[in-house]
Amino acid sequence: MSTVLGSSRQAVDVSPFTRLPDLALRTYGGAVVAASDESFAEREALIRPGRPEFRPHTFGPKGQVYDGWETRRRRGPGHDWAIVRLGLPGIIRGVIVDTAWFKGNYPPYASVEACAAEGHPSVDELSGWVEIVAKSPLSGDAVHEFPVADPRRFTHVRLNIFPDGGVARLRVHGEVVPDRTFLDGLTVDLAALENGARVVSCSDEFYSSPNNVIAPGLARHQAEGWETARRRGGGNDWLIVALAGPGMVAVAELDTANLIYNAPGAASLSGIDARRASLDDAGAWFPLLPRTRLQPDTRHRFRLDDVRTVTHVRLDIYPDGGLARLRLLGALTRTSDPITFD
């Protein structure tokens, strides 16, 4: 069953899955590897970050310019489709089909399939497709949210539209499930989203999501980091990251890139082994990095001396502000299992 939110420009999230990362996002490594047609607007737009834009009366050689994927009018049987390789393979919890700005040229129906592939297959080698969103009606210029109940790990999705038309964005929200072959026995970023880490709570996300601090790559601007509202009272802002698995953190990197006038004055890190104590037990947390001064627009690196195993790390910033990236380099313990989320 889908949820239709109306105009894409209303910026309202209803379904809980929308708080999970978009596994298909281009900035996370996603790619639209094939499409049946892209005569009016290119397929790559489906997974662009940000909300779709529109400038009326802007015409190119193919007609009105759209920020989305648009196919030609079908005169025969069949339907159009696009295949997306997920940048972050994982368990899909929900899909969004956004027809923003497509009013007289949106597809009346859509469905979504998914498959899991090992290695680096070509499009022709993809097989074992299963339906995760049944053929469902769409409206024009609207956000359609479809919860997904399949618990399997997927690497690719296929958007089917019936029979043709335009879709602005495809969002595939879920939980990252990495290939453990590339984690065990190696020094890795235990806080990386692509390795299965996840932000489980934070004090404030007024300007941008805390998930950004564990995203791949460098933040290109402030909006690609985490930024809180200005504090007018006491206290400080914080977030908690569930690591890729139980491990020992050797190096911490706190990056305030692009935050020139709104970087925190200082930060600290604490750790806990949540297999032995509750996250709510303040006495079970132990310091990894004492309160340390930060500089604006700077990548700070710190060696950590505490070699105890941790499953979660708490970042405190004083008193507020933002952070572009948090990296925690270390190794999983040999008996590590991925941390599960309730």
What role is predicted for each listed range?
Residues 105-118, 262-275:
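Short, surface-exposed beta-strand/strand-loop-strand elements in extracellular ectodomains
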Residues 59-67, 121-146, 212-231, 278-304:
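Intrinsic, low-complexity N-terminal interaction/targeting segments
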Residues 107-109, 167, 249-251, 264-266, ...:
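Exposed beta-strand and adjacent loop surfaces of beta-rich binding modules
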Residues 90-101, 159, 248-258, 315:
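A short beta-strand element within beta-rich, extracytoplasmic domains
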Residues 83-85, 96, 111-113, 158-160, ...:
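Beta-strand cores of modular interaction/reader domains in eukaryotic scaffold and signaling proteins
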Residues 2-81, 175-244, 260-262, 332-342:
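Disordered, acidic Ser/Thr/Pro-rich linker "stalks" and the adjacent N-terminal cap
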Residues 89, 129-166, 236, 243, ...:
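Beta-sandwich interaction modules
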Residues 167-178, 328:
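Short, structured interface segments
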